[in-house]
Amino acid sequence: MNTNDAKEYLARREIPQLFESLLNGLMCSKPEDPVEYLESCLQKVKELGGCDKVKWDTFVSQEKKTLPPLNGGQSRRSFLRNVMPENSNFPYRRYDRLPPIHQFSIESDTDLSETAELIEEYEVFDPTRPRPKIILVIGGPGSGKGTQSLKIAERYGFQYISVGELLRKKIHSTSSNRKWSLIAKIITTGELAPQETTITEIKQKLMQIPDEEGIVIDGFPRDVAQALSFEDQICTPDLVVFLACANQRLKERLLKRAEQQGRPDDNVKATQRRLMNFKQNAAPLVKYFQEKGLIMTFDADRDEDEVFYDISMAVDNKLFPNKEAAAGSSDLDPSMILDTGEIIDTGSDYEDQGDDQLNVFGEDTMGGFMEDLRKCKIIFIIGGPGSGKGTQCEKLVEKYGFTHLSTGELLREELASESERSKLIRDIMERGDLVPSGIVLELLKEAMVASLGDTRGFLIDGYPREVKQGEEFGRRIGDPQLVICMDCSADTMTNRLLQRSRSSLPVDDTTKTIAKRLEAYYRASIPVIAYYETKTQLHKINAEGTPEDVFLQLCTAIDSIF
């Protein structure tokens, strides 16, 4: 079954409406036993005649007291005996069937039912006309989404839509509407508004502005399900801007905003819940858009003008590119992708400018996830080409359940992805420049976050390549618990590389090339090793022996941090 089949099945069976109704019932009823409650709800769905009979409020009781069971005539008579006077002259009419009860629903309580149905039926954008460019701006609460979205809209002449503001205005204008009163309570507690309701409001707004060249949507989607719904019912966005900010900074900004603006969802309890929702949903959402090559990440823990400068560079490159096409993968010199064991001289002028010019992908990408990263065991493995790092990392992964990350491999994977970032990296390499440390660190962080919860720690080889990288890693993520130096002579490494050359014939494993690589390694690694020696994190391993002997030394060193 492919994605379209799955989507068609869910839509045909009314599954989204069923789940929305069940969730609304859970949030309103707050049952002690949610499993038993859901079983009773599903039984009611069968009695109603299927999912197509379920409304969003089917399981939302108008009163909180439980009605007695009505299982047949005997139960009805027992109920009537309990609540009616014994006097036979009491004037009441007996019905063979209870009169219809006016059940609250979106159709009966609002005047939007026909509009909502039309929105489901028709395309949002006229297929005969060019579709406006769509930019989605996402990030944690307090990350500056509204500020940056407005700046983007103003710079490019786009229309700005704040999903949060759409919902707040709707709640304010329909305060007597039971559905929106319920949504107001949901939002006030820090939970997400119902997905279909939010999508409907966005679609209504988009239909009102069909002639816009571009649209910036702030605060949507919040999770992968919303992203799928947006693509299914509206379109695939042209660009997703992710504003990453440290968790503590988000809290500070939200508390300050609560004092200044008094938004109902900025209360302390709701703030905690919103941050928790963001933490749970952000990584899968970012990964989803990364796989589609749509997202760019920005460090939002800076001055807003600095952040916007980086965003505007990215938007210019993505939506208004130069006419020259980027080189294809076949045009790229493979030698410009670093070997996983190679540490190179980073003295290029471009590298010195990297942090300023290439902050497009951010320096603090995962907000609250950084706290989880800092709790993980992080081990750097430093060693020259041919020192045996790759072999030993494989064995350590198997023994300890670590995740092995190689900066060279991460760069290769990124270049193969054909993302916007890969185009930028390719352009840099084609000019003969080195990939800036900011991009390498960003690739590392994304890979680490993707493995959170499934690993006991990280083995990182080929990094840091200079002291500045190590300092930046410590500042942005945290210092490693252990730095292992694979101490091996130049002669041993040369012999190993020559043997590998005879078996696999890599282009650069000639004697002359090997000598250059070793020279570059020693020149760059000596300051790095000295830096970690002063921090008492360095553990030197004699890598001259057999793989088994080296592995035993490594295990002894790693066991010391557990």
Swiss-Prot record:
Enzyme class: transferase
Keyword field: ATP-binding, Cytoplasm, Kinase, Nucleotide-binding, Transferase
MF terms (GO), sorted A to Z: adenylate kinase activity; ATP binding; nucleoside diphosphate kinase activity
Chain sites annotated for binding AMP 1: 168, 191-193, 219-222, 226, 263, 274
Reactions that this protein is recorded to catalyse: AMP + ATP = 2 ADP; a 2'-deoxyribonucleoside 5'-diphosphate + ATP = a 2'-deoxyribonucleoside 5'-triphosphate + ADP; a ribonucleoside 5'-diphosphate + ATP = a ribonucleoside 5'-triphosphate + ADP
Main localization (coarse): cytoplasm
InterPro entries, sorted: Adenylat/UMP-CMP_kin (IPR000850), Adenylat_kinase_CS (IPR033690), AK1/5 (IPR006267), P-loop_NTPase (IPR027417)
Adenylate kinase 2: region residues: 377-559
Keyword Kinase: yes
Cellular location(s): Cytoplasm
Enzyme Commission code(s) on record: 2.7.4.3, 2.7.4.6
Residue ranges of the region described as LID 2: 499-509
Coiled-coil region: none
Record region (Adenylate kinase 1): 133-316
Tissue-wise expression: Brain specific.
Binding-site positions, ATP 1: 142-147, 257
PANTHER family reported for this sequence: NUCLEOTIDE KINASE
HAMAP family per the UniProt record, alphabetical: Adenylate_kinase_Adk (MF_00235)
Record's function text: Nucleoside monophosphate (NMP) kinase that catalyzes the reversible transfer of the terminal phosphate group between nucleoside triphosphates and monophosphates. Active on AMP and dAMP with ATP as a donor. When GTP is used as phosphate donor, the enzyme phosphorylates AMP, CMP, and to a small extent dCMP. Also displays broad nucleoside diphosphate kinase activity.
Family note: Belongs to the adenylate kinase family.
Protein name: Adenylate kinase isoenzyme 5
Annotated source species: Homo sapiens (Human)
